Amino acid sequence: PKNWTAACVLDNATCNNKLIGAQYFNAAHGGDAGIAATRPWEYLSARDYNAHGTHTASTAGGNFGVQATGPASVFGSISGMAPHAYISVYKALWSTETGDTASGFTSDLVAAIDQAVADGVDVINYSISGTSTNFLDPVEIAFLNAADAGVFVAASAGNSGPTTSTVAHPSPWITTVAAGTHNRNSAGSVTLNAVTYSGASLAAAALTAPLIDSTAAGLPGADPTALALCFGAADGGAVLDPALVAGKIVVCDRGVSARVNKSLAVLEAGGVGMIIVNTSPNSVNADFHYVPSVHLQNTDRAAVKAYAATPGATATINASVLTFTDPAPFTASFSSRGPLRAGGGDL
């Protein structure tokens, strides 16, 4: 854009006519030296380590009509919500080595917001959680200053649903955005010992194979928590034993690592299918997995794991079907929601 002069600090890359600015903030960590000492895997630049920033930036302003790749190629071409928008990125959170989460300091977040305003952005997208109780939180005040400067701020409500009064960023000068969803469900099921459990799946065809719980399929000395979660190389180290997993459907707990990472770990260990189970009430999701998979609710977890522990257990992941159930749109179950706790719960 005319008169745009924001910095571009990237690792082995440059800005272009889409990505027009890139800066990072780590003063509260002790600068580059502090990050290098505590997070040696991180990029000392605005480059994204764990892909969350890339994901949100492309959703907001990705180019129009880009052909999807990988399993999602069945969707054809995809676009961001504002494909003609320019993007300037401000990195103030620093990732764990596994990429499952990131953290930072309030002062760096405020510095990033202030810099975006000073650079002259029109919109700030802030897909990071925050306070649910305090209008005077430093980040909320930084957004008040942004709003006073004419900058529109969209901030995430958070992913702490379905519990009530969990919504973050309660301030009235922010547009706080919950997660919505549609009424198209790719329903799936799995049959164990003549009992069928229903969930979500994109399995194209039925698959029958021996069944094993991940907790019984670990490499010697594998961490029990990582084993229950089916950690793989993408999560910092594989824990499934190929000698035990090969040719089998594996039961994995939801949590910590990306759901698709779990099916990748199963594939890398020679498994042919996966049952992913919630450990607490949450959504079930039809993801593009690396092996045929079905996602079940936490209410089925105990029965599934108990059967998987029996000698000779087998499972049949049934072919998925498209269903239309709820009115749409509606709030996704994982999304944070009101009523607000800030300001005496007036909203």
Language-model features: where?
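Loop-rich non-cytosolic ectodomains and luminal regions
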Residues: 1-347
